[in-house]
Amino acid sequence: MSSLHLRPAVRGLVMDHEDHVLMVRLVFPHGAFWVLPGGGIDQDEDHMEALHRELLEETGLVNATIGAPVWNRTHHFQLTDGNGTEWRGQTETVYMVRTERFTPAPSFSEEELRAENLHEHRWWSLADMLAYEGDDNFTPRDIASYLHVIVNEGIPAVPFEIEHSS
């Protein structure tokens, strides 16, 4: 699969000082997913500009201190973005974002959030992720194992590489 058909994206591993992770719940006809906040990089943006914009739109987090990349993820699936561009998946770079816990107050309206399939925010502990028995999926599926390494060993010197096909 050509990387020319993969949408570039960024996400934030937004963690409070107790190692809880802020995730957003995306709901689709085929199921719901807990994912890290973020999204596609606009043509005129670099990674940092895109991540600041996405965090503001989806969570209301302003002037976030963005740290090192913690993983890169390639996800193969069919996607049509808001501009009508068709993609065969996306490549995501996930950056560490340490912050005080806050109550999400997205800059996007409820209507704009729903248009992006975003329905909920939640701070998750690693223990809650591991104990979760609901129908929703975490993305990436094994996020808890990556978080365990980050919490116990620190940010990796070289970002994890994650590949997934739907």
Question: Where do the PLM segments sit?
Answer:
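Short connector loops at helix/strand junctions that flank enzyme active sites
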Residues: 7, 29, 36, 48, ...
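Nudix hydrolase/Nudix homology domain
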Residues: 31-34, 101-166
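Active-site-adjacent beta-strand/loop module that shapes the phosphate/pyrophosphate-binding cleft
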Residues: 75-108, 122
